[in-house]
Amino acid sequence: SNGGILNLAGAQTSNSEVFSGGTENISSGGNAQNFDVSGGTLNVLSGGNAQSFTVSGGSLNVLSGGTAEFFTLSSGAAAGVAAGATVHDLTVSNGATLSLLGTVTSSVFIAGGATLNVSAGGAINGSLDSSGFPTVNVVGAVNVSAGATVSDLAVDGSGALNLLAGASAHDINVNSGGQFNLAGSTTSNINIRQGGLETVSSGGAANGATVFGGGELDVLFGGSANATMVN
């Protein structure tokens, strides 16, 4: 309820709901699952775990040592993941925003209209599924700042991966309709497939890119591309 607080430590809860003005704090040994945050605030502290939940119009804060998994950020939701925190198996829906200083691993979907901002020290460490495809898929926008890294990621549909000066990326697939914008940063092992576009602007360096039929790599003034293969 409005102004109410639930503190969970060393215990487990399920099927709860945090409404606007309400706060749930999950600390060491606490485990919350199968619940909704509807306009309220969820704080996952060191040693706490939140799983199988939805944030709708509210906020999620995962602090150092905290873990959040198997969740969805719906329209209007905002989430912050601090350095030392871990999140995985998540969907960021249209109109939601995730700010990342910690680490995201595997099974991530950034929907059209959603935004993921990766700041210094943050990392998207994707993986490959049993068929060899990346488990991190971007249809919205991912902005990667200096000191941040992303790997094993696919940019699909109308998605955009924007790599700013001082950021790094490797093992990226740019698929049909996807855009990879590279400025002042370095990449390796980039696959640009039919309908995909990579643009390298001043200070950017694309190393080891492969351009497949129908794909496009544009190197602008001040940018560079090394060891490029065009199929």
Kindly give the residue locations of the regions a language model identified:
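Active-site region of the double-stranded beta-helix
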Residues: 231
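The right-handed parallel beta-helix/beta-solenoid scaffold, focusing on the short coil/turn
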Residues: 2-4, 11-16, 20-24, 28-33, ...
